[in-house]
Amino acid sequence: MYEGKKTKNMFLTRALEKILADKEVKKAHHSQLRKACEVALEEIKVETEKQSPPHGEAKAGSGTLPPVKSKTNFIEADKYFLPFELACQSKCPRIVSTSLDCLQKLIAYGHLTGRAPDSTTPGKKLIDRIIETICGCFQGPQTDEGVQLQIIKALLTAVTSQHIEIHEGTVLQAVRTCYNIYLASKNLINQTTAKATLTQMLNVIFARMENQALQEAKQMERERHRQQQHLLQSPVSHHEPESPHLRYLPPQTVDHINQEHEGDLEPQTHDVDKSLQDDTEPENGSDISSAENEQTEADQATAAETLSKNDILYDGDYEEKPLDIVQSIVEEMVNIIVGDMGEGMAISASTEGNTGTVEDGSDSENIQANGIPGTPISVAYTPSLPDDRLSVSSNDTQESGNSSGPSPGAKFSHILQKDAFLVFRSLCKLSMKPLSDGPPDPKSHELRSKILSLQLLLSILQNAGPVFRTNEMFINAIKQYLCVALSKNGVSSVPEVFELSLSIFLTLLSNFKTHLKMQIEVFFKEIFLYILETSTSSFDHKWMVIQTLTRICADAQSVVDIYVNYDCDLNAANIFERLVNDLSKIAQGRGSQELGMSNVQELSLRKKGLECLVSILKCMVEWSKDQYVNPNSQTTLGQEKPSEQEISEVKHPETINRYGSLNSLESTSSSGIGSYSTQMSGTDNPEQFEVLKQQKEIIEQGIDLFNKKPKRGIQYLQEQGMLGTTPEDIAQFLHQEERLDSTQVGEFLGDNDKFNKEVMYAYVDQHDFSGKDFVSALRLFLEGFRLPGEAQKIDRLMEKFAARYLECNQGQTLFASADTAYVLAYSIIMLTTDLHSPQVKNKMTKEQYIKMNRGINDSKDLPEEYLSAIYNEIAGKKISMKETKELTIPTKSTKQNVASEKQRRLLYNLEMEQMAKTAKALMEAVSHVQAPFTSATHLEHVRPMFKLAWTPFLAAFSVGLQDCDDTEVASLCLEGIRCAIRIACIFSIQLERDAYVQALARFTLLTVSSGITEMKQKNIDTIKTLITVAHTDGNYLGNSWHEILKCISQLELAQLIGTGVKPRYISGTVRGREGSLTGTKDQAPDEFVGLGLVGGNVDWKQIASIQESIGETSSQSVVVAVDRIFTGSTRLDGNAIVDFVRWLCAVSMDELLSTTHPRMFSLQKIVEISYYNMGRIRLQWSRIWEVIGDHFNKVGCNPNEDVAIFAVDSLRQLSMKFLEKGELANFRFQKDFLRPFEHIMKRNRSPTIRDMVVRCIAQMVNSQAANIRSGWKNIFSVFHLAASDQDESIVELAFQTTGHIVTLVFEKHFPATIDSFQDAVKCLSEFACNAAFPDTSMEAIRLIRHCAKYVSDRPQAFKEYTSDDMSVAPEDRVWVRGWFPILFELSCIINRCKLDVRTRGLTVMFEIMKTYGHTYEKHWWQDLFRIVFRIFDNMKLPEQQTEKAEWMTTTCNHALYAICDVFTQYLEVLSDVLLDDIFAQLYWCVQQDNEQLARSGTNCLENVVILNGEKFTLEIWDKTCNCTLDIFKTTIPHALLTWRPTSGEAEPPSPSAVSEKPLDAISQKSVDIHDSIQPRSSDNRQQAPLVSVSTVSEEVSKVKSTAKFPEQKLFAALLIKCVVQLELIQTIDNIVFFPATSKKEDAENLAAAQRDAVDFDVRVDTQDQGMYRFLTSQQLFKLLDCLLESHRFAKAFNSNNEQRTALWKAGFKGKSKPNLLKQETSSLACGLRILFRMYMDESRVSAWEEVQQRLLNVCREALSYFLTLTSESHREAWTNLLLLFLTKVLKISDSRFKAHASFYYPLLCEIMQFDLIPELRAVLRRFFLRIGIVFQISQPPEQELGINRQ
């Protein structure tokens, strides 16, 4: 401490001595100075001698301890300062230098703090006087250079020292002095030093402000923490903790400050050195006590240390040092902030102690953004959010609601903020000072001052901390001062100024855009875009603008924000859209000719334009990168391209200027917004913006329409709901919308239409003219539109105007009525036209004008001076519309070509001036407007952005690639296209994506129809880009894969040409037909034809050069990259791979269909990718295979065998690999996979291919049987197709394999094959049906029989098998999947095959039923017989008569018997299931025109009943009888009686052929229709002859010769009916009496009669045989009725001689007349037997009466009929009948006999006259004897007649 004092004293002593020693001091005018020095030295000496004890040392102002407040201290300080003050005021440079040097050291070491009040000026502190003194040393340009340096040094020390504090005016003064030294000093070193010092001062001023806020925040945090602890410890009573001594200003409003410092820019003198003059009141802020100062010293030390230690003036490198220091300060700050963050400390958001925690790792700006904790926040700034954190976005919204400028409550929370504000504002004002007229002089003070102020502003902005960025005071300062300054400088013709303005704008855009929405719009619209769009603007300006844009476009946040905030804002310009369009034009090189640029300039500008476009796209990619899924981790295309990461990195454009690069733009968090964008995301709703954008587009479209046709525009806007329908709505629209064409508005308002008039009235009524003089009112009225040309229209408008003017100004006395105003208005219009129109040569004078208006005021005149004033005003300024922006932009059409560069510059400068005015006016207009700015956060915005701008992008890139060979341009275009494709892909915007990919494909030159010409590097690069796109964006390419794969296909061809290798075309192509293409010398090699390269003759040189240029395409990198697309296909997602495969197949198809040279490149690739992708999940794989399989289907059927062979072989290999993977139960992937084999087999007729398919499948079965599951279906399907082939080897191999499967594979892997069991059986059945190979057929049936054994052995396997068809109950599965297919296929074989195979099939089918039927369920049998009965299905039978007949005779016959056998075997199950069907079937059989079948039918009926009758129920018997009845009725041949010959009847046979017998007799020669029918043997029933050729058919063939065809058919049918009738009679007989047959009985009767024996009465018929006992009497009566009906029909026919003759003549049945004798007799015989049996049956007593009645009637009728017979042979036929009848009657009891005998007696007597045979006579004799006895006519000789008489 003592040491410190010593050094101080040493400094002082040396300095004072040095001053005293100066010779100048000796002079008289310095006496005061001399005296002061001496006093001070004396003082020091005394002090040094005192050697005070240590505790008293504090009194000395030591640098290490803050001095104690005590009077002595002040005196001492004063005492020390006075000599120096006087020294500084001396005019001697040496003395001044010495003094300054000492002061600087004293301040630097903290010996001079100047905290004492200034004794000379109340309210100020000593330090203020010290600084003033130092500043005062600068006397303008003539000041000594050494002194200048010392001043700079001292001021820097003062500003940066941590020991002293200066504020407000004093700070300004220090800054101003350095500023002035920079401007005034002629010494370069001093200038540089001054500039560096300024930079450093500003850094410190702003850094302190930021630091203070940070410290305060920490303090608050500690405080809050302590409070919390306190609360935790003593929850009951808590004391308010002492608040820390924080320094606050008295609540001082912004306005106050503005007034105080209003003068800070106004120079009071014209001297340069006053250019920063400031008249700060000294009392401001002086009440800050030093105690508080002391408190913060320690806090500030951290930041200031770095400065105080560097005595920069002694460091030679003036430029560098300040930058280092700045950097170190900034770094230190960041470290402090980030360090705190790292500790995860919670920072309080408000003094109440609400806790708002900041998460770890959050950005430093986050805290600051939350309104610096602890700072007094004004009311307007306290949002009521539920969140405890105050977010900036909410402040913004608050702000936006408050458009009246800065909120009155806002104030500086700390004096340091005020300092910073004042400095900032001063610099802004300095930068706005205008330059002198004429060309700018780089040395002039004005220009240097402007540049310096801009440089310093840029430096402040670039280093701006959180407080600066968020405090409302600073934001308002930026809006009100900086932006206005920029609008002035932004169009400066001085490149450096312009460049600086741009840099500042960039910084603002980067860090402050949320607050500067309107300002940014003005800057873009009025400066950037204007310069780009104006054809006259200079290259330099364009270049700088585009440089700046390069930077803006490289920042994703900015790009998206521009779109969201301007293009989607109804009231803002479409900046993004215009920007892209302008850049696109520049990139295309449009408009550069007018500028007279050099080619080099044009190219560099184009490149920059492209670079911007590419940057924008990159930003969009970057912005939406989260939505992109990169399929590859590694994506380099050879070494030529950087990896995929390049898309997300932005290329660093070279920095715009030397003022420090804006790294923030390139960093990922991009602009300052990035940090708290998350908090703003609430306001960023993409859908909402999209709606806004649509509305905006509608409005713009409406305005465009309006400007062409007003009504159409209005109608459109109304239809779209954007405009109301009332006149008022429309009028308001016309008022407010500035973009409307003023002429059209005028036309619309002037129109005579009723509605238009209403709008016009509303329009005028919306004006308020009150208090305005007439001309002003008229000017206001005519500002908004251009008056229409027609007088009537003007008339209407003026009339309404006049009325409205008077309405608004009702107190006026000038105009008598509205008429006056109307006429005057009209005259003013005429006057303005007259005076200002160039067409009018003779202008109207004032007198003429006054004269013209005579008497218009109700016949009086208006005052002359009034009219005169009007004339003067109009002469001075014409009435015109207000200039809207649109009118000031010179459009191209109006521009005449500028003659010379000089003229152009002149024109441009004028335009720039105009532009600057507009910009400044607009800036000022918006400086108080608060517009809410949305910070975009959603990646969704990119979609509408891209949709909006994709066309100009595409145009720029296409033109670039098309007409420019510069590699850089090409690579930019390609990069742009890549990004565009990426965006279109990510958002699946298909049209746009396809457009870009097509463009890319087009520039590869691979797909052009004209063929490949010479390739340039850009085309090769395009190919590489296309491949890269395929590689990186494959997931999104969809249909665009088509273009890409087409190119790759062509590329392969190109590579072949390039390398000179002959392409591997497929052999056997079309070449053969046209003769060899390589035959003649003039012809090109084939491959060139393939690429469409050559026409007729060939230029070999050209080909060589093409080969060379294409050679590049074969570079290793390209080949590898192409390959990687295919190998990388495994990384595509499930949908993408399907698209990829689909288009690969399409391209392959095109290759193969090439007429000249089919190629298999893509087909090979398909095989490859199939291998690669086989490992995918099955779901994806099956979708892929659906496409590939379909392709193989087509390719496998290609007429070119080589192609098909390749396809089948590839399929085989793939299948083998696929099958190796196996398959789980219930999956169907194998089935889908193997389907192409089926398709090829089905469609390809080539034996080679079919054979190959079968071989492939056979190979699969042999090697992979264990892995096959659902694939069996396809295998059997292929063999099924092979089975019907005519090629022996194919059938043989297929059958061999099928046999192998059925015998061996089924044995081992039965459960795996169940699913295709049906297919196997079906396949076998197909082999069986191939008539060409009978042995195979028989073997196939044997295998089917074998299959049945599997089903029988393994029913469980079927039960457990689950399949798609889950509706089948488990117990039925064995039927549905096992038995049914077998039996069904056998039935198919029966229905389709030749006789021997058919028969074998039938046998096997019934064998299976008989063998396994015991396991069948009832409902299975129903299904089964539905199949079996198909055998009889008439519709399915062959058409040809002979085949049909054969079929019926053989198969149907066989089946019938077999069915009956099965029925009998399984009667219990089948009786109720099957019986009805069997009867129906039998009924069907007898109806067929086939005798054999008909007979079999009746036979079977008989068999079924006889074998099973005992088990029949009553109901079944009813059915049986009904069936018999039906058959009977149907088969009565009624047509025999009704048939009549047609008119054209053939001649009857010649008389010689006709029998000589009388026609009415049934002679021996007459033919019994049944004669030729073989009688059936008694065992016939057991075994029907399988093949017995119908005898009827022979008869029919006999008939054929004589009868015509229609008759033939009829006669044949009639014959069969007759047969059936007879068969039926026999059947009934058999059913009732079997095994007793009628024949046997007849024979017995005859024998007995012959013997006339006594044992005649042996009762044969009492045996219990036949079914008689099971039939009820009613049923028997039914049968009887049938028999008797049949008998009567035969009788009728036999009696109808005429009809029989006619039939005979027509050729029916042989050489003589037909008869029905057998039917007549046998039906009656059977009937009689039944009746007599019932008559004798004790159990049927109830029916006896009826039986007797029937007997009597039948017998009498029969006898009567017998008596009418004339023919001997006919009577002979009745012999047995009579015997039967008489024998039976003889056997009945006497009582009954009586009744009978008396009934027949007369008839029997009549019979005696016939010549009867002996046997009959014997029986008759007995009959009559019996009559005698019974009627007691005679006595019976007992011994003779053993007849019972009961």
Curated annotation (Swiss-Prot):
Q: Which residues carry this modification: Phosphoserine?
A: S52, S286, S289, S290, S394, S407, S1076, S1563, S1566
Q: Which gene encodes it?
A: Arfgef1
Region listing for Disordered, in residue ranges: 216-249, 264-304, 347-410, 631-684
Write down the InterPro entries for this protein, in alphabetical order.
Answer: ARM-like (IPR011989), ARM-type_fold (IPR016024), DCB_dom (IPR032629), Mon2/Sec7/BIG1-like_HDS (IPR015403), Mon2/Sec7/BIG1-like_HUS (IPR032691), Sec7/BIG1-like_C (IPR046455), Sec7_C_sf (IPR023394), Sec7_dom (IPR000904)
PTM text = Phosphorylated. In vitro phosphorylated by PKA reducing its GEF activity and dephosphorylated by phosphatase PP1.
Domain (SEC7) spans: 688-877
Which superkingdom, per the lineage?
Eukaryota
Renumbered to this chain, the Basic and acidic residues biased-composition regions fall at 264-277, 641-655
Motif Nuclear localization signal (NLS) per UniProt: ranges: 708-712
Comp. bias (Polar residues): 348-357, 391-406
This protein is called Brefeldin A-inhibited guanine nucleotide-exchange protein 1
Provide the activity regulation entry from the record.
Inhibited by brefeldin A.
Q: Which organism is it from?
A: Mus musculus (Mouse)
